[in-house]
Amino acid sequence: MRCNGMSPVSVAQRNTGIWAVVPLKAPECAKTRLSGVLSHAARQALFFSMASHVIGTLRASPRIASLLVVTPSESTAEMARAAGAEILWGPPDEGMANACSRAMAHIAAAGGERVMFVPGDLPLLDGAAIDMLSRAPVDAIGMAPNRDGHGTNGLICRPGAIPLFFSGPSFSAHQNAARCAGIDVWIVRSREWALDVDLPADLEEFESSIKDAKRRVLCQI
């Protein structure tokens, strides 16, 4: 049964360690910038495939204590629950920064020590990349930029350490916020964190990476 908003968190439910937060749109609203190269059905399939991959990779990481998916979508929530995630409901028109800020407040109430924000469209994300970002000093802001260096594709911090920005030049905005708060910044640059699939060029890069991986496997046979 769906419950709107956040539920009170009792002391018995407190969960320390690193919480991962994955904000996910409703599938019918996702990946609209790929409409020129993918059908509506194909875009939804891509959305679920990447989201499932990200959630599964986070769940498998020994560095992640808990996983919270923020979404307005019943179908997305069903997929996330099946993978072992908790759900925090949000309105359909909620932006990523607001969704993540609400999640951070929920996690702070639950006793979470650190929060890792991860978008649901990172098809190359793996356990090593998660481990790398999670090794940021506890009192620092750990960040991973996207391919063009302007967006933030991964961020780890203490709850409430800085305000969150997930549109426009968010990578520099997060660095400026950390600087204003007197907090050190730890930057991780890797292909696994950098590639998010929003545009046709991103899809081409992903397809190229798959071909490269297959080629490497064949060369080892």
Curated annotation (Swiss-Prot):
InterPro entries to which the protein is assigned, alphabetical: CofC, Nucleotide-diphossugar_trans
GO molecular function: GTP binding; phospholactate guanylyltransferase activity
Pfam families per the UniProt record, alphabetical: CofC (PF01983)
GO BP field: F420-0 metabolic process
SUPFAM superfamilies, alphabetized: Nucleotide-diphospho-sugar transferases
EC number: 2.7.7.106
Residues annotated as transmembrane: none
Keywords assigned: GTP-binding, Nucleotide-binding, Nucleotidyltransferase, Transferase
Pathway assignment: Cofactor biosynthesis; coenzyme F420 biosynthesis
Catalytic activity line of the entry: (2R)-3-phosphoglycerate + GTP + H(+) = 3-[(R)-glyceryl]-diphospho-5'-guanosine + diphosphate; (2S)-2-phospholactate + GTP + H(+) = (2S)-lactyl-2-diphospho-5'-guanosine + diphosphate
Reported function: Guanylyltransferase that catalyzes the activation of (2R)-3-phosphoglycerate (3PG) as 3-[(R)-glyceryl]-diphospho-5'-guanosine, via the condensation of 3PG with GTP. It is involved in the biosynthesis of a derivative of the hydride carrier cofactor coenzyme F420, 3PG-F420. Can also use (2S)-2-phospholactate (2-PL), with lower turnover, and has weak activity with phosphoenolpyruvate (PEP).
Xref: PANTHER family: 2-PHOSPHO-L-LACTATE GUANYLYLTRANSFERASE
Family: Belongs to the CofC family.
HAMAP family hit by this protein: CofC (MF_02114)
NCBIfam families: F420_cofC
Protein name, UniProt field: 3-phospho-D-glycerate guanylyltransferase
